[in-house]
Regions:
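Short, contiguous pre-domain boundary segments
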Residues: 1-22
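Catalytic cores of DNA base-excision repair glycosylases
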Residues: 17-233
Length: 233
């Protein structure tokens, strides 16, 4: 256990040994959030963007791609097509060439073009400040919509579940679901709403530095005493 949290040990819930009640899981989740907040106080979205439109585009590109790679690509992309109107008029092959290194470039180009046209046709070229409206745009699912709502607009509409968040949440026993949408349903029941936005950023940082996919570094983990799978890959 991390010694910095020793003062809370006597009061903090232990990881489940038998069937954990919903109330106990919520209490443990709240403790996890507090620990993560202390460990990663500056955790934030690692995508580079200057406005909601750029964040929307970057998040669509981030599927099955690292944020670092996306940030390299969007420098040129936003220079060429800085607005929804400009992107909607882009030539598909030219757009594909620019985003090729992000993977699945044909599908992503189609999504970006459809999304830009949707913004023009239904929202006067503005990114809607509504989860329901966002998910109606091409290439935008709950994950992307939650990122935009949380990061661009500061509104907690859900928990962003990426590979790191899903993996660590399952290890912590906060969900058993491998499907991102179903996992999110479990997480919003136990993670305090005030932590929904930051929770994902902090778990992503934790997943990159400590709770690795193949060899988690449990010995140095601030959540080890709260994790039912400590020491198990």
């Amino acid at each position: 256990m991390n010694r910095s949290s020793a003062g809370e040990t006597a009061k903090e819930p232990r990881p489940p040994r038998r069937r954990e009640t919903a109330a106990a899981r919520a209490e443990r989740a709240a403790t996890i959030c507090r620990r993560l907040a202390r460990a990663y106080p500056a955790a934030d979205c690692s995508l580079d963007f200057g406005n909601p439109f750029e964040l929307l585009v970057a998040t669509i590109l981030s599927a099955q791609c690292t944020d670092r790679r996306v940030n390299l690509v969007t420098v040129d992309l936003f220079r060429r097509w800085p607005t929804p109107a400009a992107l909607a008029a882009a030539r598909p092959r030219e757009l594909e060439a620019v985003i090729r290194s992000t993977g699945f470039f044909r599908a992503k180009a189609k999504s970006l073009l459809g999304c830009a046209r949707g913004l023009l046709e239904r929202h006067d070229g503005e990114v809607p400040r509504s989860l329901e409206a966002l998910v109606q745009l091409a290439g935008v699912g709950r994950k992307t919509a939650n990122v935009v709502m949380g990061v661009a607009f500061g509104e907690a509409t859900g928990v962003v579940v990426d590979t790191h968040v899903g993996r660590i949440s399952r290890r912590l026993g906060l969900t058993r679901q491998t499907d991102a949408v179903r996992a999110e349903r479990d997480l919003v029941k136990v993670v305090p709403r005030t932590h929904w936005i930051a929770f994902s950023h902090r778990l992503i940082e934790h997943g990159r530095s400590v709770c690795l996919a193949r060899r988690p570094r449990c010995a140095g983990c601030v959540l080890a005493d709260l994790c039912p799978r400590v020491g198990v890959p």
